[in-house]
Amino acid sequence: MQMLNIAHRGAKGYEPENTLQAFQKALDLNADGIELDVHLSADGHIIVIHDETIDKMTNGKGFVNTLSLPELKSFLIAEKHEIPTLNEVFDLVDKKCLINIELKNFDTFSKVVDLIDGYVSEKNWKYEHFIVSSFDWNALQHVHDLNQNIPIGVLTETDLNLALAFAETIKAKAIHPYYHLLNEENTQKIQEKGFLVLP
């Protein structure tokens, strides 16, 4: 089975994580895909950042969901990079690789589904260009209920068998196991059930 090179939060060994520059570097390095994390801003924009606050990554402070997009854009990562929106990442990638969107909390699912649907219907993308993943299985269930064409990845760091059962229920495309669950036996178990392994 083919090994995919997925740039976790972009090529963060070269550029600050979850920035347009990190994602561009991943494209330059011919990554098969990128992984990123999303939260919602106070005014409903999908923001690409790992933490629920901007404290660690920027020169600002505060929770992402309490700040508007203009406020978030006013703070910089590594003194020069803006926090990107998911739209900006989609436009940058432009169908060149897979985009794995990790929902960091429940309230992001409907906006992400709407955005993916828009790019498929209006910009000639395919659903296969995306995979939506989360530790919040309730959010993944809602993604499945809204649009069964969107590929789903089930994240787990504890019970692999439970994750496999849930993945079968929602017809997921992949299992995203935490690294300590990754051994030959578990990898084989996941693949035998027809799922991709995307740790």
Write out the residue ranges for each language-model feature.
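Phosphate-group recognition and catalysis centered on beta-loop-alpha active-site segments
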Residues: 1-199
